[in-house]
Amino acid sequence: MKCFSDSFLAKNGYKIILIGHKDHPEVVGTMGQISKEKIILVETINDAKNLNINEPVAYVTQTTLSVDDTKDIIQILKDRFPHIKDPLKEDICYATTNRQMAVKNIAKRCDLFFVIGSRNSSNSVRLVEVAKKSGCSNSILIHSQSKI
């Protein structure tokens, strides 16, 4: 659904700003579905500050990024482009957001926090980052039962 929505916006005159990491499979796939003239990748706050776009714009985010990771960039985009189109509600990955919020709430009360998942999973890596930012500096990604 997400790529369809992004393509629809691009075909209807919008320049798409994709907030994400260039080597992430979701970003690579999304950027491969839309003509290069219609999509631009923003990875950092500076990228957002330096955009020069003179056409209608919409933004989408890599679904595995935390809300905290994207909020500052989104605010800059909204300040710079007051008529920017938000992502469709169904394009937002609530499972990812819910997990990150749960980790945020729990990690601040923990001395040790394990995330069980693949080292190649952006979701797992991001959950460790969220736990650390939320107050549990001893947060660890466990990719194998033998590592516990």
Q: Model segments located where?
A:
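The feature marks the mature, well-folded catalytic cores of soluble enzymes
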Residues: 1-148
